[in-house]
Regions:
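Single conserved hydrophobic/aromatic residue that forms the stacking wall/gate
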Residues: 1-20, 372-373
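Catalytic or ion-coupling anion/metal-binding cores of large enzyme and transporter domains
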Residues: 21-320, 325-344, 349-371
């Protein structure tokens, strides 16, 4: 699931990591005039020449890291590239592990403890992962009957530093992690930095600490992982806020946001395509808080709205506005983005009552969001 772009794409069009989101970004940018249709089509043809999912810390790999950290995947399974010969050996190990689990009567609920969920949350936070991981963790906790909530994630995200330079926040990919030893090296690094609970049982039949006992530290000279003292950020790129706009919570991804506080005037939309048109017509200005609603689970199955966040990533707006929604966003989205706003608009959540011009403020480290005048 790792891509390398073909030759011939202009360096200023496609730089760094190549992902399956590039075609969507290019289409959005072409729609608002930030690149030509010809340039967009060139990216669509050449950005994704290989099989699999994108190789960055977006939704796909966020969940892979979470599952390995929670103990439901064999060591290194989440970081072996899709077309690597090691995948066949991994499949053979899975068969043997299944037999071992059956013989020892180890069941999912023996592994899925509160501590295991904390390990998963810490790992995706330290890796700079996607907000979609929050949805999956909470859904799995509910299914397993484990008391682990958005409030727990809020505390973890506040206290977990970012120790990895995965794209989209940095230049590295999962293939880079694979080259330095895979996900076990990342997890051993987190364990050595006091961030993981090594006593948790895993699908190997051993504890997490036992699985990682012989894993070496990150090799000298690598630039993917840093120590806790030299962290990229003292708190996670994901943060959770509550307030009169989101009484049941809203999840932020703010990797490119320097100030954890933001205040701006609402500009409201009910369709992501209207945001693309508004950007094209220059109707959105710096300092705005873009509200996109009626896209939650009840309203429309909670779709991903990358076309909207991609359109807002034009230079004159990038890092200068906030985006709030009851929808989901892609893990490659960047900026000040708050999603999963609850209650959603379709069930009468406060986000449905927002009007253009309303003043909205949020403070990520205080965990608060709200309308200035209620």
């Amino acid at each position: 699931f790792f891509f390398q772009a073909e030759d011939g794409i202009r360096d200023d069009l496609v730089t760094g990591v190549q992902t399956c989101a590039l075609p969507i970004y290019s289409q959005a940018k072409a729609a608002v005039g930030a690149m030509t249709q010809e340039e967009s089509q060139e990216i669509i043809r050449k950005a994704c020449p290989g099989p699999g999912g994108c190789g960055i810390a977006a939704s796909f790999n966020t969940w892979g890291l979470a599952m390995e950290a929670i103990g439901l995947m064999l060591p290194a399974s989440s970081s072996i590239p899709a077309v690597d010969p090691e995948k066949r050996a991994e499949c053979r190990r899975v068969g043997a592990a299944m037999v071992n689990l059956l013989q020892r009567n180890i069941r999912p609920r023996d592994i899925l403890t509160v501590a295991a969920f904390r390990n998963a949350a810490v790992t995706i936070a330290a890796a700079g992962g996607s907000t979609n991981g929050v949805l999956h963790i909470l859904a799995l906790a509910r299914e397993a009957g484990v008391d682990f909530t958005l409030r727990d994630l809020q505390q973890i995200f506040r206290s977990t530093p970012v120790l990895a330079s995965f794209a989209p926040r940095g230049p590295r990919t999962m293939v880079d992690l694979h080259h330095i030893g895979g996900t076990p090296v990342l997890m051993k690094h987190l364990l050595d930095n006091g961030l993981l609970d090594g006593s948790c049982l895993t699908v190997t039949g051993q504890t997490l600490a036992e699985n990682l006992r012989d894993v070496p530290p990150p090799p000298a000279g690598q630039d993917l992982l840093v120590s806790r003292e030299n962290c990229y950020k003292p708190f996670a790129d994901m943060q959770v806020c509550f307030g009169n706009l989101a009484p049941e919570g809203i999840v932020f991804k703010v990797s490119s946001m320097k100030d954890p506080r933001f205040t701006g005037r609402a500009v409201c939309f009910d369709d992501p395509r209207d945001i693309v048109r508004a950007v094209e017509q220059r109707r959105i200005t710096p300092g705005s808080v873009i509200i996109l609603r009626y896209l939650g689970p009840v309203a429309s199955g909670m779709p991903e709205v990358l076309i909207a966040t991609a359109a807002l990533a034009v230079p004159e707006l990038d890092g200068k506005i906030a985006f709030l929604s009851d929808a989901r966003v892609s893990g490659v989205s960047h900026g000040a983005i708050g999603v999963h706003c609850a209650p959603e608009a379709a069930v009468g959540g406060p986000i449905a009552c927002e009007e253009d011009g309303d003043e909205i403020s949020f403070d990520l480290l205080e965990g608060e969001i709200g309308r200035a005048h209620v």
